[in-house]
Amino acid sequence: MKNEMQGIQEMLGGKLVTGDHDSISLFGAAAQSDLNQISRKITDIVQKRFYNQENMIDEERVRAAIEQFEDSLRAYKSNRWRGFSQKKRQREYDTTLDTIELMSTSLKLRQVELLRETKIFERLIASLKVCEINLTECISTGEMLLQNQPTGKRDAEDIFWYSRLEKRISDLRISRSLAQQFRVEACLLQNSGIIICDQIRNILSNVLPIWRNQASLVIQKEIVSKGFGGGNSTDYQNVHDADESLQYELHRLYRLSEELNDRRKRINQIQNGKEEHP
């Protein structure tokens, strides 16, 4: 059946033939078929993007580990961490680094996927533009034929054919509106993917290194404190200066981490559609 319809379409050349009902059925059908395929591709990308967001990384596990580590930093600053055993601190340090590396790997994979989607959207947007142009040409051709239809006495079959043509043109106008709408949606999805890529790049370049430094500073402070324990006044002053320097650095990085952490939250807001994109 498909080959038969394709043969008829090739025979008619996709053009209107006055009085031929098959030509009306096939008029603009190629552009509508292309539009339908593009729509399916956009839907597939959106569904896949949602699936990746839900399954590429264990968000709850990552967030829980980071929050636990940040709670430990707060506890350390208030001197509540001194009672913890060294092994427990080391385990927490290792767990935090493992979690950070897991997030880093997952975000890199997501970034590659988003870049691939961006290229796909470029092709889809171009194809939608072509569909819109083809549909516009069909509409113009049909409208011209309607304007030049015979006047005076006509048989019922002729009137019915032009009535079908008018309805067909109306359908093509709807398809053209859909092509325009899909193109806008594809542009928005492409832009949202670019925004998310930028946020991921910032997290990989700034946020994750800061979290690693936070963990290292805590362990370094522990090593320095134990290394200078029980020394003379000069040693005490050295450890005091080192302690003050590390605490200042820890406080500075902690505040910066909180600021940059907001950007991580924006990724989830964008993915969940909680933000509007220009």
Give residue ranges: language-model regions:
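Leu/Val/Ala/Ile-rich N-terminal alpha-helices, chiefly Sec-type signal peptides and the beginnings
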Residues: 1-132
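Extended alpha-helical coiled-coil "stalk/arm" regions
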Residues: 131-157
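Long amphipathic all-alpha helical oligomerization modules
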Residues: 150-278
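Short, charged low-complexity intrinsically disordered segments located at boundaries
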Residues: 78, 135-137, 237-241
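Long, non-membrane, amphipathic alpha-helices that form coiled-coils
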Residues: 99-107, 128, 135, 165, ...
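Residues on one face of amphipathic alpha-helical coiled coils
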Residues: 113-116, 120, 127, 134, ...
